[in-house]
Amino acid sequence: MASPSPANSPMPPPQAPSPMAPPSQSPAPSPHSPYPHQQPGPLQGPPPPGHPGAYGHPMQHGPPGQGPPGHHMPPHHQGMIFSKGPHMGMQMPPTGPNMSPYQTHGMPPNAPTQPCIVSPGGPPGGPPPPERSSQENLHALQRAIDSMEEKGLQEDPRYSQLLAMRATSKHQHLNGNQVNLLRTQITAYRLLARNKPISMQMQQALQAAQQQPPPGPPIGPPGAPGGPPPGSQHAGQPPVPPQQQQQPPPSAGTPPQCSTPPASNPYGPPVPGQKMQVAPPPPHMQQGQPLPPQPPQVGGPPPIQQQQPPQQQQQQSQPPPPEPHQHQLPNGGKPLSMGPSGGQPLIPSSPMQPQVRGTLPGMPPGSQVPQPGGGPQRQVPPAGMPMPKPNRITTVAKPVGLDPITLLQERENRIAARISLRMQELQRLPATMSEDLRLQAAIELRALRVLNFQRQLRMEFVQCTRRDTTLETALNIKLYKRTKRQGLREARATEKLEKQQKLEAERKRRQKHLEFLAAVLQHGKDLREFHRNNKAQLARMNKAVMNHHANAEREQKKEQERIEKERMRRLMAEDEEGYRKLIDQKKDKRLAFLLSQTDEYISNLTQMVKQHKDDQMKKKEEEGKRLIQFKKELLMSGEYIGIDEGSIVADMRVHVVEQCTGKKLTGDDAPMLKHLHRWLNMHPGWDWIDDEEDSCGSNDDHKPKVEEQPTATEDATDKAQATGNDEDAKDLITKAKVEDDEYRTEEQTYYSIAHTIHEKVVEQASIMVNGTLKEYQIKGLEWLVSLYNNNLNGILADEMGLGKTIQTISLVTYLMDRKKVMGPYLIIVPLSTLPNWVLEFEKWAPAVGVVSYKGSPQGRRLLQNQMRATKFNVLLTTYEYVIKDKAVLAKIQWKYMIIDEGHRMKNHHCKLTQVLNTHYIAPYRLLLTGTPLQNKLPELWALLNFLLPSIFKSCSTFEQWFNAPFATTGEKVELNEEETILIIRRLHKVLRPFLLRRLKKEVEHQLPDKVEYIIKCDMSALQRVLYKHMQSKGVLLTDGSEKGKHGKGGAKALMNTIVQLRKLCNHPFMFQHIEEKYCDHTGGHGVVSGPDLYRVSGKFELLDRILPKLKATNHRVLLFCQMTQCMTIIEDYLGWRQFGYLRLDGTTKAEDRGELLRKFNAKGSDVFVFLLSTRAGGLGLNLQTADTVVIFDSDWNPHQDLQAQDRAHRIGQRNEVRVLRLMTVNSVEERILAAARYKLNMDEKVIQAGMFDQKSTGSERQQFLQTILHQDDNEEEEENEVPDDEMINMMIARSEEEIEIFKRMDAERKKEDEEIHPGRERLIDESELPDWLTKDDDEVERFHYQYDEDTILGRGSRQRKEVDYTDSLTEKEWLKAIDDGAEFDEEEEEDDSKRKRRKRKNRKEESDDDSLILKRRRRQNLDKRSKKQMHKIMSAVIKHNQDGRTLSEPFMKLPSRQRLPDYYEIIKRPVDIKKILQRIEDCKYADLNELEKDFMQLCQNAQIYNEEASLIYLDSIALQKVFVGARQRITAAADAAAVAAGDNTGEAHGNGGSDNSDNDDDDGGDDGSDDEEIATTSAAAVKMKLKLNKSLASAPATPTQSSSNVSSGAATTSKKQTRRKRSQKKYTISDDDDDDMD
């Protein structure tokens, strides 16, 4: 097959070899080639005779033209450059007449494709010249490698490629014929396995391989050199080397063997017709001559030798070209690839045909010619290293494999048989077939008949096509070219053209280089753009994925919130069934655990309630049997005649019978046992009878008409049947099922089991007169009666003011009227409410005999005698008398025990509970309380244990149920809102049968509202000075008279700092010597009166502004105070103001208290203020004629204050109630109020996990005390802001008219004050104080240490033992312990840092005092510097308008709390522009940053409260920008002015203007304070330790012992007799303290 001519060939012309690449390489395999790249293993030589080849069949040398067929070249392999003859690195397999060129696979897949280099001087069609031998290629490759090493280019990637080429070009394993044959066999096997036909070319190749004879045995002795047989050399052939000439010829009949040694590289095809022999080693090897280095031989299949193709035989007849220059091999061999006849070079038939491997004629048998284009081979070891011995060729024959030719022939035979069989079938078809089927059969028969003809025609056509398209010039382009002689002119033209070509080539090269650079740059840009687009796309995809997941998560969260809201809705709607379904769907283990726990607890409680009722029933039956037996004994013995009417059986009925007629009287008609004797005398002929069926007397005779409690569903079913409407009936039944008792268990409901006997009560008892009970009170009476009928005890816990007293009286009268239970009833009440109970009984039940058991011991003994002599129904007494006179009162068989203010029983171990449980016997008990849970859960358990000890036995079990439900599961103890509601509902479930609580807002809609305000009061200068030293050092300043230094000042330490601080907050004159020395300073007579009473106290000053306004608008005031000494000072103030008042405290006698209540509640009473102590007057009093409650100082227990508030906010109140709680800013009262709020929050939530199990230790209490004493003042200024007159007027006013009245009164007051005392403040300032009160810290510290000398050394008496105060006491007990047993120890701390920190804090506290001159000076300087700037900034903000609208108008003044109450709930720190302007005037801003902070807070408040799209929201954002811009503009102008002023004044002012001088003042002030700090670093800090007297802790408290005293230090006897009761040291009552007996 001819190759294309250079003119029309798409291949570029051959180029010279490059030094950077091997001189000659085979073309690389195309990546699109259908044939996989095979890397043959190393060759070890041909197998012995008869041994099968490497591919399963014996190696044979068949006739020419029967070699393996070539493979068709893929159409896209057009970039290959072919040489004119066979290349040294190419292996040309023999090709048949119809074989296409074959692409060799000698190079590795990653080898670059380079054109094959053609020898420039070789003749056309001749063999490659020796100059281009492989050895020269290796030398050129080595030179390129050495050149790169000299230039230091070892890191260049081409260097490693050259090394790989050098390593791989030294040995080849398989030649092209072997590879082709191997691939042909593999392809044939694959086609046979897939049952596919094999092409004709493949069949010819396989047949040629099969017909090759196996190589014969070697000729000659072992080791003798072999050569070709005689006559094989033709004329013109170069002479054979001597080694080959000396070889004897082979014997006849034995074919010569292939001369190719193992791993030899063929450089020419073998001679046709000559058998190839295995050449023995040459003589120089036998003589020990050194061999050239060879690669190590690895075992592998021997090469398959193929005969010369017929194309080469045809080319041998051509005339020989001139003989080229011979290349001498290293062993002195002859030129390569000489033909067998006359030395003519062999011409390959196709440029793609690979050569057969062979050895060079002169090379030793073991040497291998390097292959430049070979594949990856093993590297040649360096010279001098010993070569491994090649493996011996084994003589064992390999097993003969399957012959694909035989298989192919069998397949062809089968196909031919099938075709003939099919043709016979088609010829024998019946004539009855349809026309279309017969037509199809005829078509198929003709197609099968013409098959062989088609095959022959196709073969002839293909052969003719190949013969016609094959040209003689295909093999040799210059075959018919006429040579032309070269002349001088042509040479010059040639030179000129050559020069032009060079220039053009250089221009093209540069152009190509530029294009290459441009392409590289463009590729770089494209690459960057590609990656940028990829990143952008990836970012978009990531964003889309994130959005998808965010949306999915949002939807999931919305769904979860919806489900949670639905669960909460059903939970709050008591839909137990629906809630459990949602819990099952959510599969929340915690909620399911709570529900299962609740069911378990309710089940246990149900069993305990059943057991309790059974036990009570058995006791009642046994008691009835015992009474019947006792009555029978009295009748039999006749002792009933003189029976005592107070006997337990005196009221039992006795059945009588008339002897003559047999008539019987039973039931109510029968006489009582106490009247039996008189009745028998009046009715002769009658006699008593013994009736065994007589049960339990009057109790059985008067059984209540009761019925079993029907469920709500049964009632609804009855109503539905009565209505007759199906839809209404369904709705009614469904609603009833939801409203039915949610505590349903398997058998019966928990509540219905507890209240099995249900008695309907529709009206009050007939003996209850002078009023009618409200509907909810009737329901409460019905519940109380149900408790009685079911032998249960309970708690009536209605909110304060709903009439628990009236409901109790109605229960007593109902039992007396309907049940005939005449008593006696024991009602235990506080002493302060005892007169109120007596009044209520006199009003509502005058027919009931009531005994008020109180008074002195002599009076109580008279009452005891009276009780024995006369009948009574109710005994009213107090807690103390129940304990004191238990020997007398416990003997009475009480029917019912009722305890008012039942939260007094909150301590299970208190003396009252123990006495009532051990000494008093009452089958029924009832507690009345408005606050069943005050502090912690065990208090509630104590109440339930007192009522039902058989049900609520263990406190720990009760606490575990409701305190830490998850403590046993190992999960976190904290509860979320839903779990908390479940726990609360669990508590309500447990308490529902035993506790009834209604709120005012639920039952009394007409009751007016109650609004509470906290009014903050400022301190006077006297209060600030005393409070500062008491807080920091625990000392009270004196004038020094106790040390004989009158007027020079002094200090003394006082116990119980917290109480002293509270006293200073109320009034400084609660310390008597302060009042006396102040009188000496002002010229008084020991007692201060007049305006100075309110000017020295912030709270009194506030009262002086409030009380006249309330009196002018006809409001009446209840003023509650904790300390009776403060009440005395308030009395002096009220007397000076001439306000009518009444006073009730712990010292008020019981008989006087009722009179005080009547006087205040009387119509037309002129009493304006009722002055009460919180403990004495805060319980059980009806003072609804007052509508204003002033809490002068808060109690530690918030429920005490709530009780006090409800004295006015109760049934009967017609006006809105205002509660004003006074609190001094920056004082201990803030912490007290915070603790009260904490307790109220606890009471509202009823229970929180882990909240009630904390037991305070001594260290915790110490830390709490230190926190109160040394509180930091870093709170917001808004929280410490004192309200002005306008705000106070809004708090106390009930209408707009009152606000106008209050404004007018404020103006009149200010005018009057200005006229009387012009320029004087309402609170005294520091300038009005004595000199001994204005001492600095150094002097006070010195006074303190002088006072400490006596304290530290002592007076010689024994030291009080220190008690570890770590038990669990309430705040009341703790404060009482501080009052009675605490003392101070001063110790010096060693840490200077702590001392400095404390001094720094003290200095900060001093900075808040207006009395400091330095602070005033700074504020004055501050006014001059920045007040003008602040006004300018605020003016710019106020005047800013947009679209003709002033933006600041809505922000000027906030709406009132009445108009917008929710605003003040959402916004914690309300601010408006008017307030900011007022603060600028008051110099409360130190710099512009504070002003900006407040203004930004104003804008943030507007943005928090309003929606984003609202106009106010947008205006607030705009005002923020206006403020920032105005500040920058004004401050820049001020700085420029300051710089100009500095330039004008020169160097006299230092570095700047007024700002720097102000800074100098500030620095000087700071330096002075630092000096003060340094001077006082040796001062000792006071550290307080709590100590409790052991005798106080162990001895039981009595009313006199439990009274708290005001500790005033070493109090001296007053020299002058004052009208105040200074000897009275009580500030709380003793008889009403709820902790005196705990």
UniProtKB/Swiss-Prot annotation:
PROSITE patterns for the chain: BROMODOMAIN_1, BROMODOMAIN_2, HELICASE_ATP_BIND_1, HELICASE_CTER, HSA, QLQ
Matching entries from CDD domains are given as: Bromo_SNF2L2, DEXHc_SMARCA2_SMARCA4, SF2_C_SNF
Every copy of the Bromo domain together lies at 1425-1530
A Gene Ontology BP annotation from the UniProt entry: intestinal stem cell homeostasis
Give the EC number(s) listed in the UniProt record.
Answer: 3.6.4.12
| Every HSA domain range | 501-573
- Compositionally biased region (Pro residues): 7-51, 121-131, 212-231, 238-253, 263-272, 279-304
Could you tell me where the Acidic residues compositional bias lies? 1380-1391, 1557-1574
UniProt motif (DEGH box) ranges: 900-903
Q: What is the deletion mutant like?
A: RNAi-mediated knockdown in larval brains results in the formation of ectopic neuroblasts in type II neuroblast lineage. Simultaneous RNAi-mediated knockdown of HDAC3 or erm in type II neuroblasts results in a more severe phenotype of ectopic neuroblasts.
Keywords associated with the record = Activator, ATP-binding, Bromodomain, Chromatin regulator, Developmental protein, Helicase, Hydrolase, Nucleotide-binding, Nucleus, Phosphoprotein, Transcription, Transcription regulation
Protein name (record): ATP-dependent helicase brm
Specify the taxonomic lineage.
Eukaryota, Metazoa, Ecdysozoa, Arthropoda, Hexapoda
Gene name linked to the record? brm
